[in-house]
């Protein structure tokens, strides 16, 4: 399967005011035009375009949607947080073994972060929280490298939004955190010293001690140092530190002893739904 990600930062500068800035709209259009060229090269007959947090919350989203329609002929389907979480679960579940017990899926985005608590192939609870990394960085200014007081401020900000997560997990006590795609791909690439996008994975265990060592490297590093790390995805150099602060905070607060990584997430869930039922 062809897999390509392009950095857009659609919510930059306006996500807290629920607006798309003009430069962000232009970056989004440019990225979609690049994807359109690839789609043409592969003679693809069906295109599904999904909009998530930055679009669903933007007051001027129709401007972006109309430009995409005019330029490319594509209709963007904006999904709510509940459906996004359900599709993430559908994609992640394809990569997991049948017997998992209780586990928590975490998908860190720019505008939102999705958590899904499950037992084997059954969802117990799911929720999309508007606490993505782009929102965090527009709320709290981060030094380079990040300071201990800033880490505490980020953790307190996450904590204020996650009461429902703490409550449900204290009832069900998941023993595994499954980190999917995005930042977790980069954590694993750094661990395995693989250049980003050169390795196709299904699911793999991420030793906690190895993750903690990477976390320490990230929070002590400046932007230039991170950019030189083997395995670092260049589009994540800016946001990977806070993604790791968030991940470490979840592992520590919930006392979860096992970490898994999967590349599967939303797009695999969308494809599986399309293949199974149409969308």
Predicted regions and their residues:
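Conserved beta-strand/loop subsegment of P-loop NTPase cores
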Residues: 45-49
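A generic, well-ordered mixed alpha/beta core segment in the N-terminal half of proteins
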Residues: 104-105, 109-112
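Short amphipathic
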Residues: 2-6
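Helical "lid/coupling" subdomains associated with nucleotide-phosphate turnover
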Residues: 8-9, 13-42, 52-102, 117-122, ...
């Amino acid at each position: 399967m062809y897999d390509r990600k392009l950095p857009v930062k659609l919510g930059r500068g306006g996500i807290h005011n629920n607006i798309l800035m003009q430069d962000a709209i232009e970056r989004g259009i440019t990225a979609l035009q690049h994807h359109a060229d690839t789609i043409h090269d592969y003679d693809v007959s069906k295109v599904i375009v999904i909009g998530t947090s930055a679009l669903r919350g933007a007051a001027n989203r129709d401007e972006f949607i109309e430009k995409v329609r005019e330029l490319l002929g594509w209709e963007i389907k904006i999904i709510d947080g509940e459906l996004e979480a359900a599709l993430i679960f559908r994609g992640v579940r394809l990569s997991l073994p049948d017997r998992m017990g209780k586990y928590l899926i975490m998908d860190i985005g720019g505008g939102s972060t999705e958590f899904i608590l499950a037992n084997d192939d059954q969802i117990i609870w799911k929720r999309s929280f508007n606490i993505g990394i782009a929102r965090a960085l527009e709320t709290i200014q981060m030094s380079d490298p990040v300071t201990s007081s800033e880490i505490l401020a980020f953790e307190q900000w996450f904590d204020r939004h996650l009461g429902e997560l703490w409550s449900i997990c204290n009832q069900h006590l998941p023993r595994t955190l499954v980190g999917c795609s995005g930042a977790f791909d980069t954590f694993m690439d750094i661990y395995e010293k693989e250049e980003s996008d050169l390795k196709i994975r299904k699911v793999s265990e991420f030793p906690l001690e190895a993750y903690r060592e990477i976390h320490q490297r990230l929070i002590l590093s400046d932007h230039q140092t991170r950019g030189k790390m083997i395995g670092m995805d260049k589009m994540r150099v800016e946001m990977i530190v806070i993604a790791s602060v968030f991940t470490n905070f979840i592992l520590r607060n919930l006392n979860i002893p096992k970490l898994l990584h999967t590349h599967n997430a939303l797009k695999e869930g969308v494809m599986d739904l399309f293949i199974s039922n149409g969308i």
